Amino acid sequence: MALLDFFLSRKKTTANIAKERLQIIVAERRRGDSEPHYLPQLKRDLLAVICKYVQIDPEMVSVQLEQKGDDISVLELNVTLPENEEAPK
């Protein structure tokens, strides 16, 4: 049957190809826009609180928000603490 499908299949028009590409672009942008607008400020606030107690590099803090289903969001905070404990200035 695969051989029959090969000969009877229609070639995609450029309009269909453009439509598929546009759908992919829209889906990727929707996925990227799901991040709340307050997330960068939240990261700065968390970093300020952590810096009150431990001196760390801001690059060592990672904040990510994951969607688990329609109504569940998971906020993941990863902090790499220095090996030697220095008091904050």
From Swiss-Prot:
InterPro entries linked: MinE (IPR005527), MinE_sf (IPR036707)
Keywords linked to the UniProt accession: Cell cycle, Cell division
Gene3D superfamilies: Cell division topological specificity factor MinE
Record SUPFAM superfamilies: Cell division protein MinE topological specificity domain
Biological processes annotated in GO: cell division; regulation of division septum assembly
Keyword Protein biosynthesis (UniProt): no
Record flagged with keyword Cell division: yes
Functional note: Prevents the cell division inhibition by proteins MinC and MinD at internal division sites while permitting inhibition at polar sites. This ensures cell division at the proper site by restricting the formation of a division septum at the midpoint of the long axis of the cell.
Family, per entry: Belongs to the MinE family.
Name assigned to this protein: Cell division topological specificity factor
Gene giving rise to this polypeptide: minE
